[in-house]
């Protein structure tokens, strides 16, 4: 019946809204772990808690996503400039094909950490972070707090530059 469908939709909407609140600025990050290119599970926590990393960008993307690939030059510029100063990227691909995922990483010289369950949007990280569209990202500080969300273009470079100057 229509009432049941509406109820199900409302329940999903409510759950998504509650999950989104858990990933607001000021909230602690939610740990995730996915396989890297070698098939080894890499947890976000291990990257955030690494003393060398002052800020970690949790970046959700896919090779088929035009806007995601449009962000790559900005990510590369920021990573190349600040990785030795404490900036790391934990890239989570929403690709469903391993070859597409790893091919995009290689072709675009995306030389930071990449993980993927190779399940598209049907992956645990998408649920944990209430991801409904990509590109999407979360900037996490060394204490594990989300300090910014969805930094695009020059905004990412400017924010990291500002934070690392403090």
Regions found by a protein language model. Give the residues of each.
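Hydrophobic beta-strand anchors of alpha/beta hydrolase catalytic cores
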Residues: 57-58, 89
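Thiol-based oxidoreductase modules, predominantly thioredoxin-like and allied folds used
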Residues: 85-100, 110-121
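Long, His/Glu/Asp-enriched segments that create or flank divalent metal/ion-associated functional microenvironments
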Residues: 37, 71, 94-99, 103-107
